[in-house]
C-alpha cells in the first residue's frame, strides 16, 4: 500500500507532422503542433506515475478542469487499490458524464495509478495483469493520410524499413481510384492495406450502401483484397455494422470512441464487429481494456488496441496487448516530437513486431526538462470540424496498370 500524496494535470505541446501534411491542413488550423494531457500521481513513497487521456488532444482545458475537480477525492487514498479508486472517480463523474469527457480523465488517472503501482513494485505494468503472454506483437502502420503518390511511397518506405507488412490508410467513399492505387502499390512491397473511413468525424456519416458501392467499384479495378474496414459508418448505427459484416466479406472493426466497457461489450454481444479497437486513454483505463480482451475471447473475435494518442496512451495500450496476448497493435506514422523523448528505448520495432517493453511501469520516461521544453500552447488543438485540405480529384490516381 502507498497513499496518493498529490495529483496534477500536465499539458504538453510539441511539433507534429509538417505544415503541408494533409492531417494538419484538415484538423490543425494553427499549424503542425499537437497537445496531449497527462496526469501525474505522486505517492507517499516518492514514486510518480503518469497517465494520459485522449480528450486533451481536442479539449485540453476541459481535461485539466475535470482532473482538478477529481483530485481532492483521491488524495490520501491507497494507490494500490486501483479498482476502488476508479469507483471513486465514477462516484464523482458518472451522474453528469457516464459517457464522454470525464471517462477520458478517469482513463488518465487509472493509467497513472497502474504506472505508479508497478513502478513501486519494480515490475512492468503487464505484470499487474498476470504477466506478458508474448515477447512480440505484430504492428500495422497507421497513416495513409496522403494526397500524393510520393507521400504514399514515403510511408511505404518507412514500413519497409521496419519490416511492417500491414498498413492502414484513411479514405472516404469518393476515394475509389485512390484506394485501388494504394492497394496495388502496397502489394508490390508485400504489404496489405486496411481502410479507416473516419466516420466518427463525419456529419452525417455515410450509409451502408455507400460503403458497398465503394468496395464494389474498387473490386472492378483491383483484385487486391482490402484487409479491413474501420469505422466505415457512424458509431450510432450498430445495425449498419452488422449489415456490412454480412454483405461485403471484409473484416469490420471499430470502437475507438467508446468510453465504457459496458457499451463495447454490448456491441460485442450484438456481433457488430469482427474485431474491436478499445483505447485505454478513452474507455476508462487499462483495467477496462482488459475487460474487453476477456469478453472478445468468449466470442472468438480479436481485440486490436487503438493507439493514436501520445506516448503514454500508446504504451498503456501496448502493455494491455502484451498482458492479453494481443495479435496486432497500431503504430502511428506521423512524427510527433514527444515520442522520441518519452519512449526512450521502450518502444522497439524489429521485423514488423513491437518488442515487449521491459522497464518498470508502463514504459515511458518523463522529466522536468521535458515538461519545460514542451510547455502547453493553447492554440495547438485538434479541430473535429474538418477543413477542406485541397486534395486532388480522384482522377489523379488513375493508373494504366489498374484493370
Task: Give the location of each predicted region.
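Short beta-strand elements
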Residues: 37-44, 347
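Metal- or metallocofactor-binding catalytic centers and their adjacent structured scaffolds
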Residues: 42-120, 395, 402
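Shared catalytic-loop signature of beta/alpha-barrel
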Residues: 225, 234-253, 258-365
Amino acid at each position: 500500500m502507498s497513499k496518493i500524496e498529490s495529483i496534477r494535470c500536465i499539458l504538453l505541446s510539441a511539433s507534429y507532422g509538417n505544415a503541408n501534411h494533409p492531417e494538419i491542413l484538415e484538423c490543425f488550423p494553427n499549424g503542425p503542433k499537437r497537445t496531449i494531457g497527462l496526469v501525474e500521481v505522486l505517492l507517499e513513497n516518492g514514486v510518480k506515475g503518469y497517465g494520459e487521456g485522449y480528450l486533451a488532444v481536442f479539449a485540453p482545458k476541459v481535461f485539466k478542469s475535470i482532473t482538478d475537480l477529481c483530485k481532492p477525492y483521491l488524495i490520501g487514498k491507497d494507490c494500490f487499490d486501483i479498482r476502488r479508486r476508479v469507483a471513486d472517480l465514477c462516484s464523482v463523474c458518472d451522474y453528469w458524464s457516464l459517457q464522454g469527457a470525464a471517462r477520458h480523465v478517469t482513463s488518465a488517472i487509472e493509467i497513472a495509478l497502474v504506472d505508479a503501482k508497478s513502478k513501486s513494485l519494480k515490475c512492468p505494468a503487464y505484470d499487474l495483469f498476470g504477466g506478458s503472454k508474448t515477447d512480440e506483437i505484430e504492428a500495422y502502420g497507421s497513416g495513409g493520410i496522403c494526397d500524393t503518390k510520393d507521400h504514399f511511397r514515403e510511408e511505404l518506405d518507412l514500413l519497409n524499413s521496419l519490416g511492417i507488412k500491414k498498413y492502414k490508410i484513411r479514405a472516404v467513399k469518393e476515394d475509389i481510384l485512390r484506394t485501388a492505387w494504394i492497394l496495388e502499390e502496397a502489394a508490390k512491397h508485400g504489404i496489405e492495406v486496411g481502410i479507416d473511413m473516419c466516420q466518427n468525424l463525419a456529419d452525417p456519416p455515410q450509409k451502408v450502401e455507400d460503403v458497398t458501392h465503394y468496395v464494389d467499384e474498387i473490386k472492378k479495378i483491383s483484385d487486391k483484397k482490402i484487409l479491413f474496414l474501420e469505422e466505415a459508418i457512424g458509431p450510432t448505427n450498430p445495425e449498419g455494422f452488422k449489415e456490412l459484416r454480412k454483405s461485403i466479406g471484409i473484416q469490420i472493426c471499430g470502437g475507438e470512441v467508446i468510453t465504457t466497457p459496458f457499451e463495447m461489450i454490448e456491441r460485442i454481444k450484438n456481433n457488430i464487429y469482427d474485431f474491436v479497437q478499445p483505447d485505454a486513454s478513452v474507455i476508462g483505463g487499462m483495467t477496462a481494456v482488459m475487460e474487453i480482451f476477456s469478453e472478445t475471447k468468449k466470442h472468438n473475435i480479436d481485440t486490436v488496441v487503438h493507439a493514436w494518442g501520445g506516448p503514454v496512451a500508446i504504451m498503456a495500450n501496448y502493455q494491455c496487448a502484451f498482458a492479453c496476448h494481443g495479435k496486432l497493435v497500431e503504430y502511428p506514422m506521423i512524427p510527433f516530437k514527444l515520442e522520441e523523448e518519452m519512449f526512450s528505448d521502450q518502444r522497439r520495432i524489429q521485423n514488423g513486431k513491437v518488442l515487449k517493453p521491459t522497464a518498470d511501469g508502463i514504459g515511458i520516461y518523463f522529466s522536468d526538462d521535458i515538461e519545460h521544453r514542451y510547455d502547453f500552447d493553447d492554440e495547438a488543438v485538434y479541430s473535429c470540424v474538418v477543413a477542406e485540405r485541397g486534395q486532388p480529384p480522384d482522377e489523379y490516381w488513375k493508373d494504366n496498370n489498374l484493370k
